[in-house]
Amino acid sequence: LPLKRCGAVIVAAGSASRMGGIDKVMAPLGGTPMVARTAAAFQNCDAIAEIVIVTRPDLIRPISALCAGMDKVRAVMAGGSSRQESVWLGLNALSEDIQLAAIHDGARPLVSNLVIDRMVRAANSYGAAAPAVPVKDTIKVVKGGLVEKTPDRATLQAVQTPQVFD
């Protein structure tokens, strides 16, 4: 099965509200902003044809500068008022010949080339794919402040990014 062309949409448009105002996509990891490390992971993956980074308007210039040497970065653009809107805008900015889309969080820089490649190849075969890990915490279903049930942890997976689909 030939590998379809895959474009990555890196979502980096958050408000940093959960980080006490610290912008996690620009926070340094080993001296390099997380969003630059994230973009580099996709830049260095042969399964990725192009990258669109969706961010806040005030971060377009600094992120563009960080990605200046990355030839797969097609656009660094403003996102929307929600994650869903930002993803939609990013998807619409991909080239018309892109057949698969990988959605990834800009503040998740430690994604490996192997994970990206496996997700693209799985989506190429099955239509969609996302990495997942078994849930370690006990999860409760709560309604009206009361615990209704406890799902069997063995049946639960925590889904991560990149989420790839055709």
Residue spans for each PLM region:
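Conserved alpha/beta core of the MobA/IspD/sugar-nucleotide pyrophosphorylase nucleotidyltransferase superfamily
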Residues: L1-K4, S81, L91, E96, ...
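N-terminal glycine-rich phosphate-binding loop and ensuing alpha1 helix
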Residues: P2-P57
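Residue-level signal for inorganic ion chemistry
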Residues: I10, V35, G90, H104-D105, ...
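Conserved donor sugar-nucleotide recognition element shared by glycan-biosynthetic enzymes
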Residues: V11, L59, R83-V87
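Acidic donor-binding segment of Leloir-type glycosyltransferases
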Residues: D46-A75
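Short, high-confidence coil segments that cap the C-terminus of an alpha-helix
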Residues: I48, I98, S125-A128
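Short phosphate-binding loop-to-helix
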Residues: A68-L100
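Conserved core of the sugar-phosphate nucleotidyltransferase
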Residues: L110-F165
